[in-house]
Amino acid sequence: MNTPRKAVALISGGLDSMLAARVMLEQGIHVEGINFFTGFCVEGHTHAIRRQDRAKPKRNNALWVAEQLGIRLHIVDVIEPYKDVVINPKHGYGQNLNPCLDCKGFMVGQARAWMEEHGFDFIITGEVIGQRPMSQRKQTMPIVARESGAFDRLLRPLCAKLLPETLPEREGWVDRARLYDFNGRSRKPQQALAARFGFTDWAQPAGGCCFLTDPNYSHKLADLWQARGTKLYELDDIMLLKVGRHLRPRPHFKLIVAREDGENNFLLGYRRQFAHLEPLSHGGPLVLVDGVLQDGDLELVARILGRYSQGREAPAVTVRYTPLAGPAQDLTVPPLPVQELPVEWHL
């Protein structure tokens, strides 16, 4: 009996990667999934932190897809090597700070290394020609195959008939006639194929599975880079950009203000890394200070905290400021009126 050929499938948690893997399973290929953790993934982070919508069930879509397909899923931490993709994208950014083409090449390259290390034969993705304006155009697909080092061991089952034959097709491991020619942004072909396979539920991650496609998040990341004078970042930096209100009242410091109890509890874990303020006289949020306060800044920050506390209508609130070094200091200040909180401060 012939040993089945083995493919590693990039599993995002969306419909396309689920279908691509299922098409290969239908042809008798042994498939295992791989999912990469970059630190910018939307899934699960803010849901785990915020109480809002906590009652709604939340799943890890990549794990869920693997379960539906009956395949193993390998989740790989690529936070460190991925930094160069974000900081220095060879092919530039998309509409926001999303380096989509470089990202796809990086992911396929990581899958190629995994494939070689584990004795697999080829790589599959759920890409569809014309589905994404930057990374899934017919002109860019050869770039991904070449720059990742996967070359013709990269098979895209959903649009393979529109592309040159790959090694798995030429060698007869995969029947090209049973692959597909999906093209464009319409989801109807995928939905029809999902119905044939009996799939009735799937996630809709699309670009939304990465915070770098989000304009608000990208604006906050660009602000962080500008304020620090470098694009270097750590995981804590990009996690904190997902949490709270971010305000920059002055160029030399930024405030991170918790919006509710879940965020407050999360930010408590950073009290030893940031100067911070907390209300004493009224209920209210923890505020982290990212930067160094100068003369006159502390009163302003205390008044901003008062604005977001339950004492916003009171004549005065008392707050405690704890610097990174030195004793804590209590201040009593009038809360900042809303008209004195410029929209431009909000990131």
Regions found by a protein language model. Give the residues of each.
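ATP-dependent adenylation/nucleotidyltransferase module used to activate substrates
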Residues: M1-R196, G326-A328, P334-Q339, W345-L347
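AMP-forming adenylation/ATP pyrophosphatase catalytic core
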Residues: E147, F151-L347
